[in-house]
Structure formats: C-alpha cells, structure tokens
C-alpha cells in the first residue's frame, strides 16, 4: 500500500525535519492505494527524496507531500522551497554526481536523484523533476493496481 509506505518513510524523517525547522504536510487518501512496486526500491526512492529535502530545503518552510489517484495512476508529489535558487536544469540535476548546491557545503555524493530515477524506472514507474526558481518538485507516478 503506497499510503502506508509513504507515511512510514516520512515518519522516519520527522525528527530530522524538525531539527531543520521544516513543517512536513502530507495529503493522502485513505488506504489502500495499491501500486505494483518493489517495497525496498520504493522505500529507497522516498528515502532519497526525503533526505534531499532535509538537506536542501529552506529552514522555516513547509514541505508538501501528496499522494493522489488520477486516471488509473497513483501520483506522489514532493514539493519544497530550496535554500538557494537552483541554477540548473532538471535533466542536469538527475545526472550522477551532480549536486544542486554550488557551495557543496552539505554531505552527499550527488547520486540520490539518479538512483531514485533508476529505481522508479525498474518498477515501471515515471520519475520527473520540475524546478522553478527556488521551488523544487519531484513527481513519481505508477499505474494503480485494482
């Protein structure tokens, strides 16, 4: 169940988010929301996105995470305001070893989004990133299983 998985992974980041002064707002339908996905892979994808949010989101802001069903698809969206403007394209940001923070003052290798994209593809899902100034949005979509 995608709702339960999302809730569990996000729950593991609550303390870290509070430490970084982030308010996480999750909007999801009542379970079950079923998709065909490998549990370990999906956990890793959500974990990578949440780790990036905790590292790169502007302190004192809200992070919006939504799960919705639309036309036979299940769509997970992660939105946050970045600490600094992202002067990079979404395609470049998903390349291996590329990081969005030019100052490189945070831990990490620049592999998280590339891994998330690869794992999502292995599960027959779609992974997309949208960047608009300092607004970062990651969108995962999978076919809903009935």
Locate predicted features.
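A conserved beta-strand-to-alpha-helix junction within the catalytic ATP-binding
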Residues: 1-14
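Short alpha-helical Gxxx[C/S/T] motif in the catalytic ATP-binding
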Residues: 93, 112, 116
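Short conserved segment of the HATPase_c
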Residues: 85-98
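Short helix-loop "hinge" at the ATP-lid/N-box region of the Bergerat-fold HATPase_c
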Residues: 53-54
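Conserved catalytic submotifs in the C-terminal HATPase_c
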Residues: 18, 23-33
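Glycine-rich ATP-binding loops of the HATPase_c
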Residues: 124-132
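Short beta-strand/loop element within the Bergerat-fold HATPase_c
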Residues: 60-72
């Amino acid at each position: 169940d995608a709702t339960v998985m999302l809730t569990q992974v996000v729950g593991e980041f609550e303390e870290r988010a509070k430490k970084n002064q982030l308010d996480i707002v999750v909007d999801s339908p009542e379970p079950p929301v079923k998709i065909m996905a490998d549990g370990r892979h999906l956990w890793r994808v959500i974990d990578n996105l949440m780790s990036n949010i905790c590292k790169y989101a502007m302190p004192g802001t809200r992070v919006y995470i939504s799960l919705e069903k639309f036309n036979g698809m299940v769509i997970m969206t992660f939105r946050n305001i970045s600490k600094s403007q992202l002067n990079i394209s979404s395609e470049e940001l998903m390349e291996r070893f590329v990081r969005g923070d030019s100052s490189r003052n945070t831990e990490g290798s620049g592999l998280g989004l590339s891994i998330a994209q690869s794992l999502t593809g292995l599960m027959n899902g779609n992974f997309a990133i949208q960047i608009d100034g300092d607004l970062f949005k990651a969108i995962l979509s999978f076919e809903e299983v009935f």
